[in-house]
Design a protein with these regions (language model features):
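Bacterial N-terminal signal peptides
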Residues: 18-29
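N-terminal secretory signal peptides that target proteins for export/translocation
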Residues: 1-13
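Intrinsically disordered, low-complexity terminal tails/loops enriched in metal-binding residues
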Residues: 28-157
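Intrinsically disordered, low-complexity segments enriched in polar/charged small residues
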Residues: 10, 14, 18-19, 110-112
């Protein structure tokens, strides 16, 4: 009778050990995947970080983030941004979309910010949230009379 009682326990014990080993293997694989993702992304030099002014990829526009308060973690924020042309004139009637994320972690922004025109080249990015500390990229796609272009801000929070 003892052997009958110990058999189910033994089988259950083996199944539990197998489950733990499988979970450990998955965790190790996930850590290796994250390490590969992090090493595949080259972090920009320190001088590439900041609020601007930055010139767009095609040299069409310049943008400067002008937060009223320092950017903060885990809070919804609104951030004004000044968009000018290469001569420093305000860009009016631009359509601006916001994207971004943490390149070293492989995820995007936790929110979907929207942009509202304020006038005189000023726009308000609303609903911006940074969920954790580290290197973030904030990407603005700007479409105005001079054409479409992109600007990427590197931020350390």
């Amino acid at each position: 009778m003892k052997s009958l009682k110990s058999t189910p326990r033994s089988t259950a014990k083996r199944a539990a050990i197998g489950f733990v080993l499988a979970a450990a293997a998955l965790a190790a694989a996930a850590c290796g995947h994250l390490a590969m993702m992090g090493s595949a992304v080259e972090r920009p030099a320190a001088e590439a970080f900041g609020l601007g002014p930055l010139v767009s990829e095609k040299q069409t526009y310049s943008a400067t983030l002008q937060p009223v308060q320092p950017l903060r973690l885990r809070r919804l924020q609104s951030v004004p941004v000044l968009i000018t042309d290469t001569q420093g004139r305000p860009v009016e009637s631009a359509v601006i979309s916001v994207d971004g994320g943490m390149p070293e972690h492989g995820h995007g922004l936790p929110t979907q910010p929207r942009v509202t025109a304020l006038g005189s080249g000023m726009y308000q990015i609303e609903g911006l949230r940074f969920s954790m500390g580290g290197w973030w990229q904030l990407k603005l796609a700007i479409d105005a009379s001079a054409g479409a272009d992109r600007i990427t801000f590197n931020l350390s929070l």
